[in-house]
A protein has these predicted regions:
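Charged catalytic and DNA/RNA-contacting regions of genome-maintenance
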Residues: 1-338, 354, 358-367, 371-460
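ATPase nucleotide-binding head domains, primarily ABC-like/P-loop NTPase cores
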Residues: 35-36, 237, 307, 312, ...
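Extended active-site and interfacial segments that coordinate phosphate-rich ligands
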Residues: 38-55, 147-175, 494-525, 605-615, ...
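Active-site phosphate-binding and catalytic loops of NTP-dependent enzymes
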Residues: 92, 115-124, 258, 396-400, ...
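Conserved catalytic alpha/beta cores of large enzymes that bind or transform nucleotide phosphates
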Residues: 172, 177-185, 191-194, 516-549, ...
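Amphipathic heptad-repeat alpha-helical coiled-coil/stalk segments that mediate oligomerization
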Residues: 209-224, 274-278, 290, 381-460, ...
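Intracellular alpha-helical coupling/juxtamembrane segments of multi-pass membrane proteins
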Residues: 329-332, 352, 356, 454, ...
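Short, amphipathic C-terminal "tail helix"
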Residues: 372-375, 848-868
Length: 868
């Protein structure tokens, strides 16, 4: 260290305290990176890698330290690229003016930017939240905390029991965190860390146990959210407080600034929102499509017609967290109904919110201290629109909308304060001046006058001095040696005042200076620096004043966001001819002329065929749906699930009429794919998902099961499908509402033997050798699968299709006899060689009502093995 320059010693000391971050080290107008940081940054940012001496004596090139740099004023774009790749960036600033510093300039970390703590607009999707997550798990409980520091909103929940990790993973689906801080117990859960890194592309950090200590967690929660917030947390499960405490500790360590805007804590318990696992979210394509991972083609794409970024985020949060309270659901869809019924108010309200901007994130940046003049101008422009929004809300007669109107503060005083101080079109940077409005501050105006009219100011002084002294030939000049001076000819030498100080004698006269002239010279020469510094001082004062009103602004922003989301629901309902659903706790799902909300929008030039649905508590609880591939079975089942989910969001739904009994969870088992990275086959993935469903579903759940058992042999698959179907239908085991699509036509016989089960099929019309899918759900089971006809529609060569028909005919003729013979032969073997008693004893000993689906499958495999 003794051989290092003072600057390099300073750098290494700061780097030692931030080993996991790329250190942006401020040197003049650049952020410099050194050594391994430089190598990494040059690679990731396409920067030229150079080198410099790091000691007091010159070194050979191979011993010099690698370095690269970026202009400080362009840092946001570079930081955004690093954050997008999952890196942390520590910003080290000069803490004093280098020109005034005595010796080495003081430097320190002002903040650490991470994927979950980024606030720069360039790094963010304005229609999606950016959550940092804190997770605490021990042997009995689990807590999960989520915070978006750009808006100041925090959410917290906790779980107990053996399924606590699965519940936490499901919560991740609601928030899609960008970064997660885990205690040791959470970090040891491979399923959790795997979901974070693989499903959410989330940066994961093991925070150890130190960050999650309960006493410190309670202290931090009390400091950040107040005593009442701490008391609202469950006393019997400290995991919630510890998860939030770990998150807050991480924020305090990395942000090093005022975080007072983080003041909205929402603690929720299991049972407040519909729980959706990652499989259901993916299969229902709630926020992105399965194949392209795009918003277009998702349910969010259909529903989001919001006009503000905060409204878009609010609507998305409703989609991620459908409600379970009938009262809360009806309250929301009542507000939507009021907007649907009043076209003029709805359209004027929408117009008033158009271009209103992102008040939530604006106030976040203002409190954070990173907002510029343009942010202030944007906030002022948003405030100017608030009276029109409030006026339209006040005109509507709905309880929730009236509450929103009352919560919406027009913030006139804040808008006037900003308008008085900030010009209409401020420059990008507040470090270069030019954004304080003329007339706001006398000193700024005076300095600007000097800057704009330096010659004019000198001329004014010259005229004043001529008049005061009576020296007609007096003139003020300038040179690089003396600066400004007063020149008087010899003929007026006797009239020179005593306050003039002689500086130079010429042939025809003399040159003088005065204190007033020197002061003016100083002002002219330093006016630019002084006005920039003064403008920044005035701006920081204004920013602090507006920061003090953060809660008022946040409350109004929340009211605007909810209003925007409700208006979007209403606009979509009117445009797409949706109906207001009747939501209750009856357990009944009754839909008349239901439509798939996404498919009908994609098929712009085609008529979508609507279908009815009835699922009761006792009758028609389970629907067995048969029919050919491509006929629309999966679309129909997804349609029912989406209509239920939309209803519980508080939205209108695509149907002529709908009655929705609230469901606690929606499960889906649709399609199949190998999970090679986990070493799982298609069938294993299918069985794992089915197992999860049967273990976690309740009688109040909605199950969407498509082609269970198709990943194995026909008899094995049919046995598993039947066992699963019976388990779902039987009220003693589950009794959940289930849509069960299958190609095993033999299962349709269960309609006559399994209570609550009914058959449906997709209507098909044949025309010669061709088939036409009518897309209509009708009672009864399908008589055949039309597999070869579907293959023909898919474009298989005619020769292949004809050969398939011939093979099918042969199989039908042969197996029709051989299958019966095989059954008889098997019966004889089982009774003779193995013995009737062994098989029957095993069947007598088993208790079907207590068997899990997996145990039932294992028993079937065991008996089958004995019979072979």
């Amino acid at each position: 260290m003794a051989e290092l320059t003072p600057m390099m010693r300073q750098y290494l000391e700061i780097k030692k305290n931030n080993p996991d971050s790329i250190l942006f080290f401020r040197l003049g107008d650049f952020y410099e990176m050194f050594d391994e940081d430089a190598r990494l940054a040059s690679k990731e940012l396409d920067l030229t890698l150079t080198s410099r001496d790091h000691g007091k004596h010159a070194k050979p090139a191979e011993e010099q330290i690698p370095m690269c740099g970026i202009p400080y004023h362009a840092s946001e774009a570079y930081i955004a690229r690093l954050i997008a790749k999952g890196y942390k960036v520590a910003i080290c600033e000069q803490m004093e003016d280098p020109a005034a510093a005595k010796g080495l300039v003081k430097r320190d970390i002002i903040r650490v930017v991470t994927p979950g703590t980024v606030i720069d607009a360039a790094c963010l999707d304005d229609k999606a939240s950016n959550f940092l997550c804190g997770i605490y798990i021990d042997s009995r409980s689990a807590g999960a905390a989520f915070c978006d520091i750009t808006t100041g909103k925090a959410h917290l929940t906790a779980f107990t029991g053996r399924d606590r990790v699965e519940h936490v993973i499901n919560e991740l689906g609601r928030f899609s965190p960008a970064e997660a801080i885990l205690n040791d117990g959470a970090y040891a859960e491979k399923a959790l860390t795997g979901a974070l890194t693989e499903k959410f592309r989330c940066r994961v950090e093991n925070g150890g146990e130190r960050r999650f200590l309960l006493n410190e967690a309670e202290k931090n929660i009390r400091k950040q959210f107040g005593e009442d917030a701490l008391k609202s947390l469950p006393a019997g499960n400290p995991a919630a407080a510890m998860a939030l405490g770990g998150l807050l500790n991480y924020l305090y360590e990395t942000q090093k600034t005022d975080l007072s805007h983080i003041n909205d804590l929402d603690y929720y318990e299991q049972g407040r929102f519909m729980e959706l696992d990652l499989t259901a979210r993916r299969n229902l394509e709630l926020t992105e499509t399965l194949r392209g991972k795009e918003k277009k083609g998702s349910l969010l794409w259909v529903l989001d017609k919001t006009k503000t970024p905060m409204g878009a985020r609010c609507l998305r949060s409703w989609l991620e967290r459908p409600l379970l309270s009938v009262t809360a659901i009806c309250r929301r869809n009542s507000a939507v109904a009021a907007l649907v019924d009043n076209t003029i108010a709805r359209e004027e309200l929408t117009a008033a919110m158009t271009g209103l901007g992102d008040m939530e994130r604006l106030i976040g940046r203002i409190v954070y201290g990173t907002a510029g003049g343009r942010d202030m101008a944007s906030l002022r422009a948003a405030i100017e629109k608030l009276p029109a929004v409030k006026e339209q809300l006040s005109a509507l007669s709905d309880r929730r909308i009236s509450e929103l109107a009352a919560e919406l503060d027009t913030l006139d005083d804040i808008g006037e304060r900003i308008a008085a101080a900030i010009c209409d079109e401020p420059p990008f940077s507040v470090r270069e001046g030019g954004f304080i409005r003329d007339g706001f501050d006398e000193e700024v105006d005076r300095l600007r006058h000097i800057l704009k009219g330096g010659k004019g100011v000198i001329a004014e002084m010259e005229a004043k001095e001529k008049e005061r002294t009576g020296i007609r030939t007096l003139k003020i000049g300038y040179n690089k040696v003396f600066g400004y001076y007063i020149e008087v000819s010899n003929s007026f030498r006797d009239q020179v005042p005593d306050t003039y100080i002689r500086k130079q004698t010429l042939v025809g006269g003399e040159r003088f200076i005065t204190q007033e002239l020197k002061d003016l010279e100083h002002e002219i020469l330093t006016a630019s620096e002084r006005v920039v510094a003064l403008e920044y001082e005035l701006f920081t004062k204004l920013r602090e004043e507006v920061s003090g009103e953060a809660q008022r602004i946040q409350k109004t922003a929340a009211a605007i966001a909810e209003t925007d989301a409700l208006a979007s629901f209403a606009a979509v309902a009117v445009r797409n001819n949706y109906c207001r659903p009747d939501v209750d706790e009856s357990g009944v799902i009754e839909i008349k002329e239901g439509r798939h909300p996404v498919v009908e929008r994609v098929l712009k030039d085609s008529l979508f065929v609507p279908n009815d649905t009835f699922m009761g508590e006792k009758e028609e609880r389970v629907a067995i749906i048969t029919g050919p591939n491509m006929a629309g079975k999966s679309t129909y089942m997804r349609q029912v699930a989406l209509i239920v989910l939309m209803a519980q969001m508080g939205s209108f739904v695509p149907a002529a009429h709908a009655r929705i009994g609230v469901v606690d969870r929606i499960f889906t088992r649709i399609g199949a794919s190998d999970d090679l990275s986990a070493g799982q086959s298609t069938f294993m993935v299918e069985m794992t998902e089915v197992s999860d469903i049967l273990h976690h579903a309740t009688k109040n759940s909605l199950l969407i099961l498509d082609e269970i058992g198709r990943g194995t042999s026909t008899f094995d698959g049919m046995s598993i499908a039947r066992a699963v179907l019976e388990y779902c239908a039987d009220k003693k085991t589950l009794g959940a509402k289930t849509l069960f699509a299958t190609h095993y036509h033999e299962l349709t016989e269960l309609e006559n033997t399994l209570p609550g089960t009914v058959n449906y099929n997709i209507a098909v019309r044949t025309k010669g050798e061709d088939i036409i899918f009518l897309r209509k759900i009708v009672p009864g089971g399908a008589d055949r699968s039309y597999g070869i006809e579907v293959a023909k529609l898919a474009g298989l060569p005619d020769k292949v299709v004809q050969r398939a028909k011939a093979v099918l005919k042969e199989l039908e003729e042969e197996n029709g006899v051989q299958y019966v013979a095989a059954r008889k032969e098997t019966d004889q073997v089982s009774l003779g060689a193995i013995g009737e008693g062994e098989v029957l004893d095993a069947l007598r000993r088993c208790q079907p009502d207590t068997l899990t689906p997996i145990e039932a499958m294992s028993l079937l495999y065991e008996l089958k093995k004995k019979l072979q």
